[in-house]
Amino acid sequence: MNKNSEINLKEHKIFFVGGKVQKVKDNNILKGKMYVESFIPAKSNNKNIILIHGGGQSGSGFITTADGRRGWLHDFLSHGYSVYVVDQPGRARSGYSSTLYGEYMDRETNIEDAERRFTAMAKKGNWPQAKLHNQWPGSGLRGDKIFEEYMASQVNTMSDRVYIEEMSKLALSELIDLVGETVVLGHSQGGPFCWLAADVRPDKVKACVAVEPNGPPFFNVSYGGIKHSHLNKQTFKKNDFDKKWYQTSLEPDRPNGITYSPLTYDPPLKDDEKLIPKIDENKTPENLVQCFLQKEPARKLVNLSKVKILILTAEASYHSPYDHGTSNFLKQAGVKHDFIR
């Protein structure tokens, strides 16, 4: 798309989906609503796509970039897609209340974390692929105008990952019922929302595009002895299967493998039953994490297997060492998909 090409809209509007009424101090308050901004092009291909941002982000990241260029929204509009950009419940324009949603994580305003993981990986990244990074405009360091604009766009994320997935699943179900058949694109912390949406609406979600989805399965990893600020509550210890440049958490963070909240498995999990993780015995190269799968016999993700899926990972990203784990988890669970790294 030409960066200056004109895009005409048939309709542009804002609305909210999801939410439940909760009584707080004798007041009835709507909790878990999701902000949606819709863009309907004048020249439509009669296809829809829902864009779900990641942690520390809002839907604005799909509209424009930190250096002022057009975001992915405009690319999809130029190809005729009707685009629905959301702010996750409890985030940005969906509204936040500590009474309703609890504590925030502190990572979104952590400058060192942002430089290392997002903007200056070649200089500060502590995983093997970081040296390949060359795409960020400007220096990627504090004091740089584009970096400061990026940091100003960051918004806090609530700590309760299970609850945010449950609220988002409810809101996305309502949105999908409203717009009909759709593609769902989720980024990073919003990546697993693709799995949740496909699980609850497998006949309406035509495809999932998971851009560096939250992972790896079950256990988190810490690079170079430095924990990402959102992992501060977890304990890490060197395992026999860890490479010298990372450590794996002692306890699982995602009890459902690729999500915090439940998915539909066959055979189904009982109320008091959990997936059992087991290290993948297929050895990975030195620059890749040794990830976990289900203990065999593996349960199948019967609803996700009905949906076209693409996992997309950038070569220098901190996801690059471990997103194969998500791909292998889906494969073991009977889900055909494409994985590009």
Language-model segment annotations:
Residues 331-341:
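Catalytic histidine neighborhood in serine/cysteine hydrolases
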Residues 43-45, 49-85, 91-132:
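Short, surface-exposed "cap/lid" segments of acyl-processing enzymes
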Residues 203-222:
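A conserved short beta-strand
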Residues 305, 311-313:
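Short beta-strand/loop motif that positions the catalytic acidic residue
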Residues 2-44:
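N-terminal cap/lid segment of alpha/beta-hydrolase-fold proteins
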Residues 185-194:
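Gly/Ala-rich beta-loop-alpha elbow adjacent to hydrolase catalytic centers
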Residues 193, 317-325:
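Conserved alpha/beta-hydrolase "acid-adjacent" motif
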Residues 135-137, 141-155, 159-183:
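Conserved acidic catalytic loop of the alpha/beta-hydrolase fold
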